[in-house]
Each structure stands twice: as C-alpha cells, then as structure tokens.
C-alpha cells in the first residue's frame, strides 16, 4: 500500500505543476511564475487534505531522484549557444566576476548596516549562489546553512518573477545581457524563468549560474573579510 501512496504523491506534484503551467500560459505574465504557482497549489492541497509534509516528501522520492538530471538538462541550451559564448568569453567572465562580487558585498553590507551579527552576515552573503554551493559557503564562513537556504529561495523567486520585467523596463534588450544578469543573482529559478521566455537568455543564464557558483565560492571568504576590514 505504501508503494502506491508514493506514486500518488508523485502524480500530485506533477498535477500541481501542470495546473500552474496552464495558468501561466493562459495569462502569459511573469507575475504568474510557474514555480510560485506550483508551490501555492501544492501547499493548498496539503493544508486542505491535512497531508503531513514528511509523508508528501517521502512520496516524492521518484521526482527528487531526478533533480540531478534536471540540472544536467540545463546544459542543453548552453551547448546550442556554445560557439557564440566562446567568442564572448572575456565579456562573460568579467561580467560574472563583477556580479558575484557585488551580489555578496551588497547583501553582506546591508545585513551589517541592519545590525546583524557576523554569523548572520555570513548566512546572508551567499544568497545569490545556487543552493548546494550557497549552503556549503555559509557553513564554511560560520553562517547558518538552513537560513541561507531560505535566502537563496527568496533571491531566486525575486529574480524569476521581477528580473526579466525590471531589465526590460530599464531598456535592456539584448537577451545575452538579460540572461547573464538574471543568472548571476537568481541562480536556478531565474534560469528557468529565462528558459521559458527566451532560449538565448536561458543559455547565458545557465553559464552565469555555473560560473557564479564557482567564482563566488572562491571570493566569499575575501568579501567577508573585506566587509569587516573597516569596522
């Protein structure tokens, strides 16, 4: 019986995503973000049905096991744009390095100005890095990885919902620039949003996601020390 329940929860997740996708396609607005809608739909079902979250997560084992493959799938549009990206590697690398540095510095300084402890500054610092790397960076700096995970999700949601809209309003028209910008600050969630909007933006967001994770993990200790250098 338990085996059947596992598959039922898996199908429930797929149904929630399908329903969110239909709503997103129907209104065609970045506000109706597929990820956010899926979370809201599933949360409502769990609350109304009084389904324990632990049971739901255990029942999603088949989908959870596919998370690694979904990350690998992000490499497909990157491969399709590989030649163009190779010609612009200097611009891409410099943009990603600057974006990584400023994303960590701004978050850390804001936390410091708000009176946060060094532990909380270390927790907030890697908010714009993809989840696994961000949690490890936070732990290494003396932060709280679990709280960092929340910050990563919030940063991802903000970028995936508003990133594309804000850049368009600012007059940024090049999909390459949009992809690099969104991927640098909103990691996987922002990249998925770019994928849904424009393949080129999705490709550049993918490479920004990967490079920012690597570069930020190297720069994080130096940025953390820099924040407290003048304090």
Swiss-Prot record:
Membrane topology of the entry: Multi-pass membrane protein
Q: Classify the main location.
A: membrane
GO-annotated cellular components: plasma membrane
Q: Where located?
A: Cell membrane
Q: What is this protein called?
A: Uncharacterized protein HI_1298
- Taxonomically, the superkingdom here is Bacteria
Family as reported in the entry's similarity comment: Belongs to the YohK (E.coli)/YwbG (IPA-22R) (B.subtilis) family.
Q: Which Pfam families match?
A: LrgB
Would the keyword Transmembrane turn up in this protein's UniProt record? Answer: yes
PANTHER family referenced in this protein's UniProt entry, alphabetically: PLASTIDAL GLYCOLATE_GLYCERATE TRANSLOCATOR 1, CHLOROPLASTIC, PUTATIVE SEROTONIN TRANSPORTER
What sections of the sequence does the record tag as coiled-coil?
none
Transmembrane annotation, as ranges: 4-24, 29-49, 58-78, 95-115, 147-167, 211-231
| Keywords (A to Z) from UniProt | Cell membrane, Membrane, Transmembrane, Transmembrane helix
**Species in which this protein is naturally found:** Haemophilus influenzae (strain ATCC 51907 / DSM 11121 / KW20 / Rd)
């Amino acid at each position: 019986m338990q085996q059947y329940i596992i598959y039922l929860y898996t199908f429930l997740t797929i149904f929630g995503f399908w329903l969110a996708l239909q709503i997103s396609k129907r209104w065609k607005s970045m506000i109706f973000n597929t990820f956010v809608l899926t979370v809201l739909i599933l949360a409502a079902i769990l609350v109304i049905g009084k389904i324990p979250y632990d049971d739901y997560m255990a029942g999603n084992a088949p989908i959870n096991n596919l998370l690694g493959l979904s990350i690998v799938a992000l490499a497909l549009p990157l491969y399709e744009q590989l030649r163009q990206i190779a010609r612009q590697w200097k611009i891409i690398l410099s943009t990603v390095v600057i974006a990584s540095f400023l994303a960590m510095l701004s978050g850390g300084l804001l936390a410091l100005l708000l009176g946060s402890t060094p532990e909380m500054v270390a927790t907030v610092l890697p908010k714009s890095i993809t989840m696994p790397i961000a949690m490890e960076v936070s732990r290494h700096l003396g932060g709280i990885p679990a709280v960092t995970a929340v910050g990563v999700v919030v940063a991802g949601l903000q970028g995936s919902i508003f990133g594309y809209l804000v850049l368009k309003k600012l007059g940024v028209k090049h999909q390459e620039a949009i992809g690099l910008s969104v991927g640098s600050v909103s990691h996987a969630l922002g990249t998925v949003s770019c994928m849904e909007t424009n393949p080129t933006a999705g490709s550049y967001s993918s490479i920004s996601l990967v490079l920012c994770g690597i570069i930020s993990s190297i720069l994080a200790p130096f940025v953390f020390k820099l924040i407290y250098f003048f304090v």
